[in-house]
């Protein structure tokens, strides 16, 4: 690797206040799928929302085999400034020291964290629901175990917010910034059906062009303008986009939850101009950092059952106005037309039934794949 090699995120998740989790002298083993290969790795651990310091008693990374098992010979003990244990201050992120491990693109990793102390519910754990099966041990440090004993299962990631690889100078990174439709809500667990997963597969399959990582920074419920289940898109843009290692492009799919106004607060009911202003601000901030921005059109939700009264004619007018701006905006470098990809031509306020998971809001596995297929790979040459 040349001296100009740089770190690029091969996997990420957006930190948020976890809705589950309490631990006491236990090991977590969590699965992540790499979008980009490499032979030098590091792990990022976040205590972004913790109310007090987080004690890490040990951490390992390995290639995942099946279930809670790891591939023999692939286990690597992580260190933090040369030490096996570490304390992460409230609100902080900790980077591990690099380790050597041959990682193929789209390979599954297992990151194990030993949490030696009690972490109660009021700690405010940092985590995200994962659409992956992850594992919690009985009491003890099982980071090095080839097959970790299992006390319980979880579909969340906890504390780990990124895995980076040392990559060639021309390698780029694509951030997928969005809400539950980027996070892959309702998609089949352990099937890797999110649209960023499909984008990563397509980028790898082209066998040419610039190497690109895909970092999923989707956050269920996320809005552009107001916080909900974590920071708003505008508030987290620096942390979840501009601060990510190796970022060169961002695809922004946000605005649907602004329109839906889940908490039904009149003062949070946005106009099209307010949503567009938020997207414009993201474009300015991206370009100021040398990052290209792709705007994704908002998909239809006219027959939504996930939340009663989410759709109304006024909100549809706002959606159409925002989409019209995205398709024509000089402020954006390109468009990913997810609305066109998913909508029913006969009922354009709704998704085509085959692309609808059944709640009128979230796509099916096929719909998520269709979204990943709708992105022009020429944008990343």
Predicted regions located by residue number:
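N-terminal secretory targeting modules
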Residues: 1-177, 187-190, 208, 380-381
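Short, solvent-exposed loop/turn and secondary-structure capping segments
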Residues: 121-126, 185-192, 225-229, 262-265, ...
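Alpha-helical scaffolding within the catalytic cores
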Residues: 158, 196, 200-203, 229-244, ...
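Catalytic nucleophile-elbow at a beta strand-turn-alpha helix junction centered on a G-D-S/GDSL motif
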Residues: 171-197, 220-223
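Structural recognition of the beta-strand scaffold that forms the well-ordered cores
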Residues: 173-178, 182, 212-218, 248-253, ...
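Oxyanion-hole/transition-state-stabilizing segment in secreted/luminal serine hydrolases
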Residues: 187, 219-274
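Signal peptide-proximal N-terminal region
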Residues: 200-212
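Catalytic His-Asp segment of secreted/periplasmic serine-dependent ester chemistry enzymes
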Residues: 234, 260-262, 299-381
